[in-house]
Amino acid sequence: PWIVMKSNIMNFPFYNTSTDFGSEVHRALEDIIHGNAKPEDFTGDVQRALENAMLAWEDLKSKYPGLEVVDTELDVDVPLNSVTNSEYPDLVMTGKIDVLFKHDSGYIIGDWKTDYAEKRASDHKRQLSVYKKMYSKLENVPEDQITTCVIFIALRETVNTGKFGWKVDIGRKSSPFPTFEGHLQKILGWKKDPEKFIETLLAHQEFQIYDDEDKL
């Protein structure tokens, strides 16, 4: 509830150097995929991440014959009630797919990640499971023909050891979508009953800390 309040009600901005680095790498990948740049056009960690992305791309090509890029930064917007039970027919779920691949047996929804570690892999996979369902509904593609893939391209140690690795993490057949749907239904419940949201928020530890600091 605290995250919902900060991002959707109080509209707190969020900036950090990791986000800046990730955005720069994403923009560069877009240019490279569309033939407007090469990894060697960049420097430092951005170049290293781009070189890792090319290695990961080649790895996917070796595992999925006929692999080619369909689109990048692909907007996917579908009615909310097409992916979950909802009494709000006007609500739309929006998302953006980093890269969509097509191969001889189906599609791959890829997500470039510049995280220094894999500890948030389950969160990323949950997000991709949502995009998978959304793309399936949008383009009428059976879900069993869509694979999801988190592509880590800047894996590092907490203490700088010089490591700068990559990993292709293919989604499992068992989808984490039900976990996301449970969270979504809770938020929809708050929309229907705002008092329940306030009760949950006031009981939340982060809000209590914030409230105590505000009294100082």
Label each region the model flagged:
Residues 7-11, 31-39, 194-197, 201-208:
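Short loop/turn hinge sites at secondary-structure boundaries
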Residues 125-137:
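An active-site-proximal "capping" alpha-helix that borders the catalytic cofactor pocket
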Residues 81, 135-216:
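Metal-dependent nuclease catalytic regions and adjoining charged, substrate-binding loops involved
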Residues 28-115, 119, 137-147, 158:
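Catalytic cores of nuclease domains that cleave nucleic-acid phosphodiester backbones
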Residues 10-11, 15, 83-91, 165-171:
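Short, polar loop/linker segments at the starts of domains and inter-domain junctions
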Residues 1-35:
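Charged, glycine-rich intrinsically disordered N-terminal tails and low-complexity linkers that flank
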Residues 17-21, 117-125:
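Active-site metal-coordination segments of metallo-dependent hydrolases
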